[in-house]
Amino acid sequence: MKKICLLILFVSVLLSCSDSERSNKNPYLPNYSVNLSIDMNLPAYSNLKFVSNGVIVPNNGAKGIIIFNAGSGYNAFDAACPNQDVNSCVAMTIDGINAVCSCDKTSYSLFTGLGGKDYPLKQYKVQVSGTVIHVYN
């Protein structure tokens, strides 16, 4: 009986683990290398000091990087529409707490990256050190 309980516990833990690499794969978006640092003391990024504010940093990733202050931390997503060919749309725009695709007008939450389509926003890792935000993959 004890072995069965341990087996069930082990299988439960194993199944609850997720692979962020697998869930972040998207056939529409290439895997560009991202290594970006921004300082929130600079005027272009000072809005990131406040919850529910975001900025788009161009010339990184596929169509730029969206950085968003989610309150409990920062989220970073590619600004390319995740359900469209990367060459068919311009960068997404920020509308409050959502990113909106320029092609199909789909809205994606900047808290979760989820929208109403097959693929969520492509998410990047974030580290914060003082006023510097480092985004990478």
Where are these regions (language model features)?
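Extended Gly/Ser/Thr-rich low-complexity repeat segments
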Residues: T112-Y119
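A sequence/structural signal for flexible, mid-protein segments enriched
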Residues: S18-D19, S102
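Sec-dependent N-terminal signal peptides
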Residues: L7-I8
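Positively charged n-region of N-terminal signal peptides that target proteins for export
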Residues: M1-I4
